[in-house]
């Protein structure tokens, strides 16, 4: 693994020197995506959820595993990824979740923002809001089945003997935690957008007659939104467009995965289950969306 990372790093360094203009263009695009598409939505949501989970209320302070885990899923579903991962890792740091439960929930509570699926994917790509709603319902139906199995098989939650001290300044702590999360997300988005631009342009130069499907694969490998946009352009009118878009969303892109993995490692949450469930998503969700 270390040798592979070393080879990949040297390859990217060489490509950066050979294509500085494209690297700059990719960085600018990454900054644009973060500041215009992610930051305005993520910042208020993260501040509110961080403030919310730091308050002692019955929504999360409960010994009912059904209520606790479903409410965590609800918070994750509203925000979409990587907001859900931020909520789960914060709850792990606060002691609401242990390492095992946080690992399971990180794997299960993985879904794109409803506004993204219904608005961008449904209206802009499929040109019908119903298709976006159907895809979103399939994603959450699959996740909720996994969640129910986890809840039924998980041990009961015991009453805490140690009462966590209330924060003297929950708003200030929420701002501080949000800043750290956004810094991780922003850096990851900009980096992988730059990498995707470099790899995408290099592939087009080396293989000028590359099939459209492979170009879509290259674009979506690193960054989900760019891959979906390209699929909508190159595969417009194709009967396979819904299946391809569902595959891209189920895979989510390396950029999203790295954002979540960085958050998980920061909170010392294992990621093996998360990786396993991403493969299950890729196998299940596109087939259901294509057939239903």
Predicted segment positions?
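Membrane-core helix-loop-helix motifs of multi-pass transport proteins
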Residues: 97-150, 259, 263-287
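Hydrophobic faces of alpha-helical transmembrane segments in multi-pass integral membrane proteins
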Residues: 9, 40, 44, 48, ...
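Transmembrane helix-loop junctions in multi-pass membrane proteins
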Residues: 17-28, 51-60, 119-121, 126-129, ...
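Selected transmembrane alpha-helices and immediately adjacent juxtamembrane segments
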Residues: 5-47, 135-210, 283, 287, ...
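Alpha-helical membrane segments and immediately flanking helix-loop junctions
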Residues: 64-126, 217-265
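Short, non-transmembrane cytosolic segments of multipass membrane proteins
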Residues: 63-68, 148, 152
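Hydrophobic alpha-helical transmembrane segments of multi-pass small-molecule transporters/permeases
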Residues: 10-13, 30, 34, 47, ...
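Juxtamembrane/transmembrane-helix boundary motifs in multi-pass membrane proteins
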Residues: 1, 24-33, 68, 100, ...
């Amino acid at each position: 693994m270390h040798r592979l990372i070393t080879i990949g790093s040297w390859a990217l360094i060489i490509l950066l020197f050979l294509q500085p203009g494209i690297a700059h263009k990719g960085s600018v695009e990454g900054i644009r995506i973060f500041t215009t598409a992610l930051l305005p939505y993520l910042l208020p949501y993260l501040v509110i959820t961080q403030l919310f989970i730091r308050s002692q209320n019955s929504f999360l302070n409960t010994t009912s595993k059904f209520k606790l885990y479903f409410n965590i899923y609800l918070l994750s579903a509203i925000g979409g990824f990587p907001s859900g991962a931020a909520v789960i890792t914060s709850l792990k740091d606060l002691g609401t979740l242990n390492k095992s439960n946080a690992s399971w929930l990180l794997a299960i509570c993985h879904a794109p923002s409803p506004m993204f699926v219904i608005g961008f994917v449904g209206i802009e790509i499929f040109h019908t809001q119903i298709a976006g709603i159907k895809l979103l319902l399939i994603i959450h139906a699959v996740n909720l089945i996994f969640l129910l199995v986890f809840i039924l098989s998980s041990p009961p939650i015991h009453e805490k003997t140690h009462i966590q001290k209330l924060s003297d300044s929950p708003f200030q702590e929420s701002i501080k935690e949000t800043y750290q999360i956004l810094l991780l997300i922003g850096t990851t988005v900009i980096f992988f957008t730059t990498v995707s631009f470099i790899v995408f342009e290099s592939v087009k130069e080396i293989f000028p007659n590359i099939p459209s499907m492979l170009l879509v694969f290259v674009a979506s490998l690193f960054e989900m939104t760019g891959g979906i946009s390209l699929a909508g352009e190159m595969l417009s009118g194709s009967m396979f467009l819904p299946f391809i878009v569902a595959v891209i969303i189920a895979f989510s892109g390396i950029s999203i995965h790295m954002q979540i993995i960085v958050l998980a490692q920061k909170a010392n949450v294992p990621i093996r289950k998360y990786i396993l469930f991403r493969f299950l998503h890729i196998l299940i969700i596109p087939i259901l969306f294509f057939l239903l």
